Amino acid sequence: MSTIENFDAHTPMMQQYLKLKAQHPEILLFYRMGDFYELFYDDAKRASQLLDISLTKRGASAGEPIPMAGIPYHAVENYLAKLVNQGESVAICEQIGDPATSKGPVERKVVRIVTPGTISDEALLQERQDNLLAAIWQDSKGFGYATLDISSGRFRLSEPADRETMAAELQRTNPAELLYAEDFAEMSLIEGRRGLRRRPLWEFEIDTARQQLNLQFGTRDLVGFGVENAPRGLCAAGCLLQYAKDTQRTTLPHIRSITMERQQDSIIMDAATRRNLEITQNLAGGAENTLTSVLDCTVTPMGSRMLKRWLHMPVRDTRVLLERQQTIGALQDFTAELQPVLRQVGDLERILARLALRTARPRDLARMRHAFQQLPELRAQLENVDSAPVQALREKMGEFAELRDLLERAIIDTPPVLVRDGGVIATGYNEELDEWRALADGATDYLERLEVRERERTGLDTLKVGFNAVHGYYIQISRGQSHLAPINYMRRQTLKNAERYIIPELKEYEDKVLTSKGKALALEKQLYEELFDLLLPHLEALQQSASALAELDVLVNLAERAYTLNYTCPTFIDKPGIRITEGRHPVVEQVLNEPFIANPLNLSPQRRMLIITGPNMGGKSTYMRQTALIALMAYIGSYVPAQKVEIGPIDRIFTRVGAADDLASGRSTFMVEMTETANILHNATEYSLVLMDEIGRGTSTYDGLSLAWACAENLANKIKALTLFATHYFELTQLPEKMEGVANVHLDALEHGDTIAFMHSVQDGAASKSYGLAVAALAGVPKEVIKRARQKLRELESISPNAAATQVDGTQMSLLSVPEETSPAVEALENLDPDSLTPRQALEWIYRLKSLV
């Protein structure tokens, strides 16, 4: 904001604006003026750049022209969406006074603050993604982290112990807005994130947090929520809740509990693992060819959001998983009937949040009614499903016949967007409203009846009833008959050829008609608000119903996917290990134009590490990733792409796959690789699944080999994690001879003439050839380069004392060998008989051969 030195020099309207702006200095202020929201001074300049709207000037105040930009009120949602997507927050200032009775500027106040993490408007949200507000706190013992989805009321907290875990949480939750304390030490952890909001220290005070949360939940303490002994998480949660209340300017009745997320309850995946497994986002940042793109055929937005939460937080409780498996199995014969009905339920979860915030629009209530209308059919279909968990969901979703009847009576079939447009409440719902509407709509009929009646009563054939904007309703009699006007006719206007009169009945009717539209609209708004009061006492049951419907959508979807994609139900075992028969990569098999080659896998305490060798393009990375994805799918309760799967307990999944420079942080490919490797070696346990792909690249051969060897030893002997270790260092294939629990497998390739066929099938034992030059030739590397590479390869093999180990079988020849031309010097030597040469001839041959080389 430009410095305003002399406040009194401004006009009263600008003084009002400046007072309101001073309360919200860091965010944009939309100031309502008639049919527009106006922005002034620096706000106007900023908005014109962000929204690409015209920057103009408005008169002058304090002797200076005022920079101004404006947007029409009816298009405000579109502009808010643009600003929120850019991480901006906006204070919405409305006229709350009556211009007709106001002395000076109309009274205005900020009625809500729209921020990226607290939006609930349908137009501003991505319907199939959670939109989270988060707060982060740090002290000497670790981190506190809280998230709130204001569009559903889901409130969570956690206490990540270290920086890596905190980074993984930030990546998993991906908040739209993040609150942090002004003295937050680990700024590098959050720098570059969208929607950062610096908050004063006192907002994170623990006693204030407990008080805020108890007040919100109507409790004396937080023991019942299991968060009493999580002080760091509570500090974050307290700040977050206060911020949500401040921005919404209303109570938040849909936030009725808080849940502690504990590491031991779910499989932990760090940021690199989530990225490498391409769960909801591919490596390029898009949504194509991700696990979600294959698994998510849910028919409601709230079901889609729940499935993504499951995928990012696989549960370790086998009781929950077995229940989900049983439900999926029971639902497989009912998916075709259930999905079309579920599709009609829509996004009930977010509609309920807007109801709680009292911002639900008429079409929200119409959609809620439509959702209620699906419940009887859903309940009837589910009655036939022989499954206790399904019947529990059926009961939880309820029926809400009374609320359905209420909304069917109250709201018209296709209501307008806004209640202020009128015509929302159905005819017959309220007698007084019907009367006001009849007055507004039926004025012409009444006037015609009055004219006929008065003509008959007075006998005056020139009498007629009319209306004009200046004098309102009137009875007009020609000047020739005006002396016969009844005594109760009061003169209103004299014309050249007629007199106009008013009677008490017509005056009363005039007052009614002129105010009927305004009264009808005011009463309609009142009745609409009363609908909220009738619905909100049922909010808790409605939220449970929405949750049950979302879960049913996810489970029906997983049942459909299992049947359509030929998935099998995995079996959980007590000991660490993974045994997969005919396993497939869930994403790759969908994008291939040819049948996917299924592969087995066997990991157990006695066979806990597989050294995977084979050619580039042979399928090593696919094989490793499919193992992790099958494990991940099993631990959300889903069926999996395989013929048979047995899987033991898993606490973490780690991946060190692929490589990329982190230029923004000044870290090279090798540094990124080593950082991820260090995280694995520090945090993996015997219950962890570890994928290590090409460890040791990016440095010298011997450095890389030494690091890869030491890492493999550590994982196999000390940590004893279940490990898939892909490598091009053939020396590592000796590890099974040197330690227990390690085995070699390889991906096969076949040569056929001048071509190479990658079989993509996993075989026991080490690979016999590298095929690096073959792949280079396939990629189109020029023949002369391939030829030179082969010459160099032979030189290196002849020099290396460990050539045999490097080659495994002594051959490193490319399958796509380009026939070499015989050197002229070699040809000359082959034709030479040294025994027949004189000393002079021998000397001449040496010079000749020298010239040929």
From Swiss-Prot:
Which keywords does UniProt give here? ATP-binding, DNA damage, DNA repair, DNA-binding, Nucleotide-binding
Q: Which molecular function GO terms apply here?
A: ATP binding; ATP-dependent DNA damage sensor activity; damaged DNA binding; mismatched DNA binding
GO terms classed as biological process: mismatch repair
Where, in this chain's numbering, is ATP bound? 614-621
Keyword DNA repair in annotation: yes
Question: Sorted alphabetically, which SMART domains does this protein's record hold?
Answer: MUTSac (SM00534), MUTSd (SM00533)
- Which Pfam families does the record match to this protein? MutS_I, MutS_II, MutS_III, MutS_IV, MutS_V
Q: Does the keyword DNA repair apply?
A: yes
Disulfide linkages recorded for this protein, renumbered to the chain, are: none
Any GO CC annotation of this UniProt entry: cytosol
CDD domains, per this entry? ABC_MutS1
- Homology family: Belongs to the DNA mismatch repair MutS family.
Q: Which PANTHER family match?
A: DNA MISMATCH REPAIR PROTEIN MSH1, MITOCHONDRIAL, DNA MISMATCH REPAIR PROTEIN MUTS FAMILY MEMBER
Functional summary from the UniProt entry: This protein is involved in the repair of mismatches in DNA. It is possible that it carries out the mismatch recognition step. This protein has a weak ATPase activity.
Q: What is this protein called?
A: DNA mismatch repair protein MutS
Task: Name its species.
Answer: Escherichia coli O127:H6 (strain E2348/69 / EPEC)
